[in-house]
Amino acid sequence: EDLCKSLDIPIIAGNCVTYEVAKRLMEAGVAGLMVGIGPGAACTSRGVLGIGVPQATAISDCSSARDDYFNESGKYIPIIGDGGIVTGGDICKCIACGADAVMIGSPIARATTAPGNGFHWGMATPSQILPRGTRIEVGSTGSLERILKGPALLDDGTHNLYGAIRTSMSTLGAKNIKEMQNVEIVIAPALLTEGKVYQKAQQLGMGK
């Protein structure tokens, strides 16, 4: 709270995964909130510390805190989903769970112009004593423009992220982010495998 009051710039805090912590940070005066502990491709926090909450649950709980805080104070604090986001579908699910925005690492690291040359280093906690990140090879799959805007060369949802969001929103009948945050969510693991026998056998699309 003292930090937020002492600085003339907006403070984005995180990362948190629970309703209680999210609400307290909002009451302390943060301008935005990062949500997610451990889901990142290069993050090892869950293994090193044994701490973490599934990302969909974390975003849902923290967005509930945002809505309650808004009703109480009139101040809207954006929720930023951070970690485990690889495909356009991942982004869409984060928004459906309540996120106002997302932060992505691996998709950007796969750009041919990324400085890692196909590697992604989890540096959220670069402690020399107890590091919680590792260096992983994600490969280089295309230009940053192709990854974000297409046209896609890959069929696994990692290219044309903007297009995925637009198409998902139109399919759901959502005109904006706020409407997409209110769509019905169904927990259905079978959606990833139902009817995908040939994709899985041939290592294509969702079968990779």
Where are these regions (language model features)?
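Glycine-rich beta-strand-to-loop/alpha-helix junction loops that act as flexible
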Residues: 12-15, 37, 81-85
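Short acidic loop-to-helix transition motifs that present clustered carboxylates
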Residues: 16-21, 86-88
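Glycine-rich tight-turn/loop motif centered on a GG-T
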Residues: 1-10, 38-57
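Non-cysteine beta-strand/loop elements that form the S-adenosyl-L-methionine
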Residues: 31-39, 104-105
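Hydrophobic, small-residue-rich alpha-helical packing segments that form membrane-like cores
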Residues: 1-11, 19-34
